[in-house]
């Protein structure tokens, strides 16, 4: 009898809790609007993370979701001439292919339109701003994000976002922490509207050295710690070597490490070629990733796909794939399938491949 009464009492308590929860949810929705709170179930749009390709198949795989996540803050940093802007322009080109509107906030005043066009960027549809101060740049970003019409914004770079107080002051004036305070305020203001508008904001950043570091890496990024916390993905990009054609250096081998990733496992690394004036080598990645995935066979110096030999040596194999876009498309689809990614939307044509040896 006592057990039955206890169960009945517990049942009433659970019913009271459920009613109290329903009442609280209804009050929140009345006060803040429908959708301000919801259950994170399978039907929730929050569960589906849309991604934009980086232009590098290997990096798309390393990121775990097939590219960089929409509606998030991204940081790409590295030493000078490591490929930061090149990688970002590839992302812009890929987003434009999907019909998205892209904006480039050129705080460094260093964007090369001819180079951007070579990477596949549609200059006629690209919005560009060259602000005078850091406050002006971030206010422009905030306005574009709140419009809901822009799907990708690039800020190049955080180091060039100079606070107004520093510009108006004398050359020798000390402005301690002014840029960090500016970035911290911008992150607090931007983060909610970025999520609502599903707009991706990429911040390109530079590296500085901390003084007096005895243990660990002395490297740090500019603009304080706020960006590190608010960024969903942080990419560390480095140049690891040169690519030569006889005596001429025609490109770089580049390594990218996923330092932070809130949407997939982090700390993955990928290497690819960046050719001078042309961008990321897609056929080079297909050869390397195809061998790793078992799609392309390598025997000695020969590369084979199925029963067909596609070239002796890596450069000859790349040349074969450039000349045979249907084979390149098949290899890419199989590589994507082996990593659980969506198939490519089309074949790699000669115009899409950015390597011309």
UniProtKB/Swiss-Prot annotation:
Keyword Manganese assigned: no
Key word Glycoprotein present: no
Keyword terms, alphabetized: ATP-binding, Cytoplasm, DNA damage, DNA recombination, DNA repair, DNA-binding, Nucleotide-binding, SOS response
GO CC terms: cytosol
Principal subcellular localisation of the protein: cytoplasm
HAMAP family linked to this entry: RecA (MF_00268)
Role: Can catalyze the hydrolysis of ATP in the presence of single-stranded DNA, the ATP-dependent uptake of single-stranded DNA by duplex DNA, and the ATP-dependent hybridization of homologous single-stranded DNAs. It interacts with LexA causing its activation and leading to its autocatalytic cleavage.
Name of the protein this chain belongs to: Protein RecA
Organism the protein comes from: Cereibacter sphaeroides (strain ATCC 17025 / ATH 2.4.3)
Gene: recA
